[in-house]
Amino acid sequence: MSEIPEHPRPRRLAHWINPTGARKVHSLIDKVYQKKNLEMAWEKVRANKGAGGVDGQSVADFELQRDEQLDRLHRELRDDVYRPQPVKQVPIPKAGKPGEWRNLGIPTIFDRVCQQALLNRLEPIFEPEFDDASFGYRRGRSPHGALRKVWKEIEGGSQWIVDADLRDYFGSVQHDKLLALVARQVADGRVLRLIGAMLKAGSCEGRHYTSSEQGTPQGAVVSPLLSNILLTPFDREMRGRGYRLTRFADDWVVTCETARQAKEALVAARHILSALGVELHPQKTRIVHVRYGFEFLGYKIKQGAKPLHLPASKIRSGVRNGALYAYPRDRSIQRLMDQVRRLTRRKVPLTTVELIRELNPTLAGWGRYYRRAHVRRLFHRLDAWIVRRLWSHRFKRWRNVGWKRLPESLLYGEYGLVNLIGLIPSIAASRSAST
């Protein structure tokens, strides 16, 4: 695994926040409500965009009153009268699970700026405390870094996998345990009360208010950091016992050399997580050999014994017995196809150029995430299917006339449709060299 790049700015911030190097930071709230910090927080919230919360105020609305809003937030935090509003609960479909939904908690823009300002000051304090096993929501780390680590461990002989899932992690976080862990590094009582108020702000769905005695809302700016804080003792304890843990937020695996070691690792994980108030999902936690495959961060990783079940294509992507392969999991493929279907329905009142403009961000993001996997056949098939969807939308029927009036050369050339197979590094390099 490549070295994680160092970033001097967080170290400088950490020194400024805690110049004495004391184990705990005693004075932090004044650095949270510092006007420059609030301005930086607002710029981050504005760049991320997103919908408004329960007060109905949008990012554009906030921007019209930017100075007044930031002054108000500064005063409320300084005078210790700030109170967060409930988050707006928005049900969204679970990826790859038709008919199943999860709630996304959306704070108001005002509260989002406050959370980002708090995050700006907490992150430099806690980042040095996080374990090397943790890859989620950390500067210089990524899902692909986590996947590379797991891949190398499997290639090194650790082929038994503890494939685990946490039961309703974000919804079951115990506030007292989380705040106790924050208090190990932060002794500023006002900051601790501020975090507690954010956690207990509750939620609104329509006009129905629900109090929050546990959990941290998915969608809150500070939730990823808080999730890492809560699970850091788990990371340290597992690695301290010699287990090869890799974690990205609440998604984690342990690679082991034997089935017995994997069973012991699972027992240890269950015990450590229980002490943190976190449960494993009994139906979604298993021990498996890599030859049978497991899923991690949207990928299916499997040792080849048979050809992968991918549709035939003119582009060869064979599988050798005993070799290790990674490809998008079925739910990820289905989710992409559902998005394309929705955008290319025949009744969608857009021109082909407008459709491509809508499709491209989805195709580019999905393709770049999976382009280093074993996806030549899959990308080739998806490219052909997407072109046929565009033909169907344009000519209102599934007939082989589209290629005459709307050839692929026009779609990929003048119209700029993202070509998935062209995102694969070796193919992209070959095409670049030939032009």
Language model regions located:
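Non-catalytic, polymerase-adjacent accessory regions of viral genome-replication enzymes
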Residues: M1-D67, D71
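Core structural elements
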Residues: Y33-L38, P84-V90, K94-G96, L199, ...
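Conserved polymerase palm-domain catalytic core
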Residues: E76-P91, E129-G293
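Short, solvent-exposed helix-loop connector elements
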Residues: N103, S211-T216, A323-Y325, R341-L355, ...
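Duplex nucleic acid-engaging cores and interfaces of nucleic-acid transaction enzymes
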Residues: I109-F110, C114, W151
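A conserved non-catalytic segment of reverse transcriptases
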Residues: K200, L276-T351
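A glycine-rich phosphate-binding loop feature that marks nucleotide/adenosyl-phosphate handling sites
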Residues: T285-G293, L359-T362, F379-V387, W403-L410
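Extended C-terminal regions of large enzymes
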Residues: W385-R389, R394-T435
